[in-house]
Amino acid sequence: MTNPFDSAGSKAPPKPFTVSEGRREVRSFVLRQGRFTPAQQRAFDERWPRFGLDYTGQPRDLDATFGRPAHKVLEIGFGNGAALRFAAQHDPSRDYIGIEVHAPGVGRLLNALADDNADHVRLYHHDAVEVLQNEIADGALDEVRIYFPDPWHKKRHNKRRLLQPAFAELLVRKLRPGGRLHCATDWEDYAEQMWDVLDATAGLVNRAGPRGSVPRPDWRPQTHFETRGQKLGHGVWDLLYDRT
């Protein structure tokens, strides 16, 4: 097991989370680790062997990983882990995989999963594109959730947004027919881009119709990102797509 942060505090940061732009790769996030508390460090030391998935670059048998056949739900960029923990608590019949590059959020969720005895959850602390490309088999996922990705609201930074055509096509490959993609954002401009990209992606059908959104589903709790956005006067858009 390769500990992302050993107990001495030496870092082994993940590679940049990237989206394609022509021949070069554009980072879709800026890595800000923030304060790493002693409790979060202990989480990596003690909890990672139970709940963590080390990146190997090889296809992974998810049924073997979880020890059962069950619907597989992937959340990309789970932040502090509130939505992923909520889902795991309220529907333990599913298996959940979370990907997050910011170590404090991973450490926090590791501790919460131990408190919940949530052995139907596994976490990656790695580049989501690499995980999807190399470790998740085509058609292996029943659902992908992407909640409040970085909006990169300055126009010159829009190319850094995660939801780009190449990434959408990658998601389609990893979802089984009949699967589901659920995205949420509190930036109207990003919702517009999501519609531009996802409505035009072969293999995805907007459940609410072209450029449509749905009320917040019961399986997504109101997150601190959403609360913050509403305080700033932002709307919230939930986009739900079926994989054909």
UniProtKB/Swiss-Prot annotation:
Residues 156-161 are annotated as: Interaction with RNA. The active site is at residue 150. One of its GO terms (molecular function) is tRNA (guanine(46)-N7)-methyltransferase activity. It comes from the Bacteria. InterPro entries: SAM-dependent_MTases_sf, tRNA_(Gua-N-7)_MeTrfase_Trmb, tRNA_methyltr_TrmB_bact. Pathway: tRNA modification; N(7)-methylguanine-tRNA biosynthesis. Substrate binds at residues 154, 186, 223-226. Residues 1-20 are annotated as: Disordered. One of its GO terms (cellular component) is tRNA methyltransferase complex. Pfam families: Methyltransf_4 (PF02390). It catalyses: guanosine(46) in tRNA + S-adenosyl-L-methionine = N(7)-methylguanosine(46) in tRNA + S-adenosyl-L-homocysteine. Keywords: Methyltransferase, S-adenosyl-L-methionine, Transferase, tRNA processing. Its EC number is 2.1.1.33. The keyword tRNA processing applies. Belongs to the class I-like SAM-binding methyltransferase superfamily. TrmB family. Catalyzes the formation of N(7)-methylguanine at position 46 (m7G46) in tRNA. NCBIfam families: tRNA (guanosine(46)-N7)-methyltransferase TrmB. PANTHER family: 3-DEOXY-D-MANNO-OCTULOSONIC-ACID TRANSFERASE/TRNA GUANINE-N 7 - -METHYLTRANSFERASE, PENTACOTRIPEPTIDE-REPEAT REGION OF PRORP DOMAIN-CONTAINING PROTEIN. This is tRNA (guanine-N(7)-)-methyltransferase.
